């Protein structure tokens, strides 16, 4: 190694640098700095080996200047950092942006390992009293004990509630997962190395080998192109989503249900959760969500369903042989013996395409005889799906396959009953029970696919039909006229149109989607969701189209209400729908309604949206009760706070009383899928949190808010909406300011998802999707959509009457919904930094718009001050020291990336902005004559100067990784 320069001696240890940022350990079991320092040391050594001392020194120097800015908030440090970064040549700036982005990903991994470690320590001590984690964690065992011991529920009541509840997790491919799958897999291996390195019984040789493996994985991740060079298709998104089933969810579900059995035993229930209790269900939108995504065609939907069926049978095939090995007994019930004898006589000779049990199973192994028949059918099911997927037809007859889940469950149930009857229930409750639980959870289709479409598209189809029938234009009819016609057709029998109906491409697309639903087995599908739904006719239209396209088992139709006005009108719309006799008979006492968090937030700001969503749920439940209907709420939450995200447990427990009632559907979007299911322990924790919180909310609902709290919040919401809209929609130059002050215009280059970032190509904030709107403000660490409106609302009620402060503090302490709303905004303030937003303004915003930026930053500071007053906190996050520590450790990297991004945007947007470049720093060690210039060649088609586009995208990804709430 080269001798250390004077600068490097000051920075001899990254460990010391990290400790400078964080004032001491948070607790005895706090190893975060240790983990962080180890990963960064290894990375910096790799950087030095690959690119030389100068570049490593530059990265550390940037880090040091940024750390000084973070501790002293001296704006000159940002200028100093800017000069250092802009003097880099294109290749170097890409390598440095990539290094910082990589360091943030490593910091995330260190943090995940620390969280899991703390959890294990806590479980060993049997101690759940740690306030910080108790608020956001919910252990199923802890919840059951609390319900029985503290809340005096009887164990039988708890068991009954638990086995009848359902949590349906809906995976959606929202364009927010900004890390490539190739990297996610490497991250997973880094995480595993780190866990093993710190385990107690590790030998010196193990340690050495693990350290080598760790370095290998860190280097492999660094050498992988972080940027997606092509936009993913819906099929890519589906395959990415399905990979989580393969890797964690498939085995995670039975493992979790065993833990539930153990927790029940500990409160005195000696029964297991029945294998067919629908505790956890999975659905998906990948390949079914066509709202604003023209790339999701009927063919895509068909492919995705066949692919999921193929994957499900493949997973069962891979496990059935383990079960055949386990069930080698000869004792069995007469019922099973008779079945086995019949099968034994009818089976063919050998099956050479199997590795195990390829010879005919002897009759004295009756369970294996039964299971080998199941295996044949699973094999045929998989091969038939594979052939249909690749060529559109299959020679395997359908009767040789499994067409519904009963055909798979029935022989397994027979084995289970027989084992129990022969005194072998201990064996029955092993692998066989796990298998039965998997079949009950995943069925033959792995997940149920929801279809989502805009209501307008259905109106177009019906308009074409009524015009074709010569009875007028459906689009022009009043709501009453529409309902009358739809109901008369639904009550009648005649087909509405033939093949000669004149169709545009859009109309064909809608009808062909219904034909795909009719053609495929009904267990492939879940709900049909109508976005932008406003009236009963929107729902009836889908019912009629399902009938016209011969859907034998119609999908349940779910209206989605998302804008503020739609949420306000939703209860009345639902009441009108329930008062239609035909519809009430059709739904059989069950209805689902989806509420959208993203668009309501974009439309009115976070405070008003959160309160309106709360009230809408209360009203909708009331309407459903009046009509004797069980209502399931489907929550369309994003990963970020601006789009309704936040800790799961808190989010569920802060819902209004009576709104969950043991059935909950919730979306798991984009990057949240990786955070929830990326590892076995994360998957376990996710299933546990949802199950425990749903049970607790049902059995111990939160207090209903006092009338005076409601009145105060009503008043605040009006002021907040007014303030939010006066800036976002009414300030004439706001859109121009937004486009200049953030990287919104450049966002589309990230190739995150298959969906366009705008609903309409031109247009203002209205047409912009909620994700890029939030993403852009997150990048500049200003988070405007989250906090805007809160300050004005607080100020208004405090100026009216200072006693309102006491009431707000009482609401914060006693009302979970209000507390969660405030805490999440506080967390966003802790991640925000108006100084960084000011840098973007200084570099990118035209002079005459500077006052608008200054006004918004003053508003930010004032809102933060008022929020702390309401929460009764002196500093941000004083109640959550762990989170505070984690954020401090990341700040310096994120700041460097912010500065790099702001200056890169300046160079992209202003051709007259010239910088003095220093000579190359980076040396490719393999060939010392070659600088890092090669990385510039990865993007030959860029319309910008060399290297700028990649540097920009790398900063976006790095900041997203650092703030962990992408869009």
Curated annotation (Swiss-Prot):
State the organism's lineage.
Eukaryota, Viridiplantae, Streptophyta, Embryophyta, Tracheophyta
Q: Which gene encodes it?
A: PEP4
Q: Give the protein's recorded name.
A: Phosphoenolpyruvate carboxylase 2
* Enzyme type, top EC level: lyase
For the biological process aspect of GO, one term held by this record is: carbon fixation
Q: Where in the cell is it found?
A: Cytoplasm
Q: How does it assemble?
A: Homotetramer.
Q: Which organism is it from?
A: Zea mays
Q: Where is the active site?
A: 174, 602
Q: Key word RNA-binding present in the record?
A: no
What is the activity regulation comment for this entry?
A: By light-reversible phosphorylation.
């Amino acid at each position: 190694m080269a001798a250390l320069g004077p600068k490097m001696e000051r920075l001899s240890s990254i460990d010391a640098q990290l400790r400078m940022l964080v004032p001491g350990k948070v607790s005895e079991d706090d190893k975060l700095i240790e983990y962080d320092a180890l990963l960064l040391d290894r990375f910096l050594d790799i950087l030095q080996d690959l690119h030389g001392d100068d570049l490593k020194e530059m990265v550390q120097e940037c880090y040091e200047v940024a750390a000084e800015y973070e501790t002293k908030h001296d704006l000159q440090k940002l200028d100093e950092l800017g000069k250092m970064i802009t003097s880099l040549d294109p290749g170097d700036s890409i390598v440095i942006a990539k290094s910082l982005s990589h360091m943030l990903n490593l910091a995330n991994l260190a943090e995940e390992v620390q969280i899991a470690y703390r959890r294990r320590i806590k479980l060993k001590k049997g101690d759940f009293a740690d306030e910080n984690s108790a608020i956001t964690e919910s252990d199923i065992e802890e919840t059951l004990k609390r319900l029985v011991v503290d809340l005096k529920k009887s164990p039988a009541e708890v068991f009954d509630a638990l086995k009848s509840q359902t949590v349906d997790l809906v995976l959606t491919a929202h364009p927010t997962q900004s890390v490539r799958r190739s990297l996610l897999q490497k991250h997973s291996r880094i995480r595993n190395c780190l866990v093993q390195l710190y385990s107690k019984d590790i030998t010196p040789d193990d340690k050495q080998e693990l350290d080598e493996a760790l370095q290998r994985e860190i280097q492999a991740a660094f050498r992988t192109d972080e940027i997606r060079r092509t936009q993913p298709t819906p099929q890519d998104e589906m395959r990415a989503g399905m990979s989580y089933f393969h890797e964690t969810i498939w085995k995670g579900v039975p493992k979790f249900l065993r833990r539930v059995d153990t927790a029940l035993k500990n409160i005195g229930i000696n029964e297991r959760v029945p294998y067919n209790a629908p505790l956890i269900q999975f659905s998906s939108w990948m390949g079914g969500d066509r709202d604003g995504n023209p790339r999701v065609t009927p063919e895509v939907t068909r492919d995705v369903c066949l692919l999921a069926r193929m994957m499900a049978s493949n997973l069962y095939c891979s496990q059935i042989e383990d079960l055949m090995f386990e069930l080698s007994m000869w004792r069995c019930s007469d019922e099973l013996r008779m079945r086995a004898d019949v099968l034994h006589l009818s089976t063919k000779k050998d099956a050479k395409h199997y590795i195990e049990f390829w010879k005919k199973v002897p009759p004295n192994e009756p369970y294996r005889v039964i299971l080998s028949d199941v295996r044949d059918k699973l094999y045929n099911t998989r091969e038939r799906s594979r052939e249909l997927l690749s060529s559109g037809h299959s020679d395997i007859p359908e009767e040789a396959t499994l067409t519904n889940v009963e055909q798979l469950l029935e022989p397994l149930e027979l084995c289970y009953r027989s084992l129990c009857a022969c005194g072998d229930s201990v064996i029955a409750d092993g692998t066989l029970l796990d298998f039965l639980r998997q079949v009950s959870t995943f069925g033959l289709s792995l997940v149920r696919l929801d279809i989502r479409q805009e209501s307008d598209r259905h109106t177009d189809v019906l308009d074409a039909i009524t015009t074709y029938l010569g009875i007028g234009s459906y689009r022009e009819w009043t709501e009453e006229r529409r309902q009358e016609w739809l109901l008369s057709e639904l009550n009648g029998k005649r087909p509405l149109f033939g093949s000669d109906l004149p169709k545009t491409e859009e109309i064909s697309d809608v009808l062909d989607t219904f034909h795909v639903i009719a053609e495929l087995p009904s267990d492939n599908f879940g709900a049909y969701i109508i976005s932008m739904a406003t009236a009963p006719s929107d729902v009836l239209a889908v019912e009629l189209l399902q009938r016209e396209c011969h859907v034998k088992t119609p999908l349940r139709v779910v209206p989605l209400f998302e804008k503020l006005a739609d949420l306000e009108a939703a209860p009345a719309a639902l009441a009108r729908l329930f008062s239609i006799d035909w519809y009430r008979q059709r739904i059989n006492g069950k209805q689902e309604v989806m509420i959208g968090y993203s668009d309501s937030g974009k439309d009115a700001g976070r405070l008003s949206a959160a309160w309106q969503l709360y009230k809408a749920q209360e009203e909708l439940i009331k309407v459903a009760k009046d009509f004797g209907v069980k209502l399931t709420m489907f929550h369309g939450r994003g990963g970020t706070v601006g789009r309704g995200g936040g800790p799961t447990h808190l989010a569920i427990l802060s819902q209004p009383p009576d709104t969950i009632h043991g059935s909950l559907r919730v979306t798991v979007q984009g990057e949240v899928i990786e955070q929830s299911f990326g590892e076995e322990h994360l998957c376990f924790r996710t299933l546990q949190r949802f199950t425990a919180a749903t049970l607790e909310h049902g059995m111990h609902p939160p207090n209903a808010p006092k009338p005076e709290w409601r009145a105060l919040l009503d008043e605040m919401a009006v002021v907040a909406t007014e303030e939010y809209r006066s800036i976002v929609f009414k300030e004439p130059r706001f859109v121009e300011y937004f486009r200049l002050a953030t990287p919104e215009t450049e966002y589309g280059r990230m190739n995150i998802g298959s969906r366009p970032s705008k609903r309409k190509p031109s247009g203002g904030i209205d047409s912009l999707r909620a994700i890029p709107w939030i993403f852009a403000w997150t990048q500049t660490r200003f988070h405007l959509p989250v906090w805007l409106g809160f300050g004005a609302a607080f100020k208004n009620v405090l100026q009216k009457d200072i006693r309102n402060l006491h009431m707000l503090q009482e609401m914060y302490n006693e009302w979970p919904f209000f507390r969660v709303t405030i805490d999440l905004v506080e967390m966003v303030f802790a991640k925000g930094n108006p100084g960084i937003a000011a840098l973007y303004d200084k570099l990118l915003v035209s002079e005459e718009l500077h006052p608008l930026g200054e006004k918004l930053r003053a508003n930010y500071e004032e809102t933060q001050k008022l929020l702390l007053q309401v929460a009764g906190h002196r500093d941000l996050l004083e109640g959550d020291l762990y989170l505070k520590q984690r954020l401090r450790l990341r700040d310096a990297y994120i700041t460097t990336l912010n500065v790099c991004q702001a200056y890169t945007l300046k160079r992209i947007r202003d051709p007259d902005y010239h910088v003095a470049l220093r000579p190359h720093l980076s040396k490719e060690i393999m060939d010392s004559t070659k600088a890092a210039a090669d990385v510039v060649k990865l993007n030959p088609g860029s319309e910008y100067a060399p290297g700028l586009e990649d540097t920009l995208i790398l900063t976006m990804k790095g900041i997203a990784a650092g703030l962990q709430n992408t869009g």
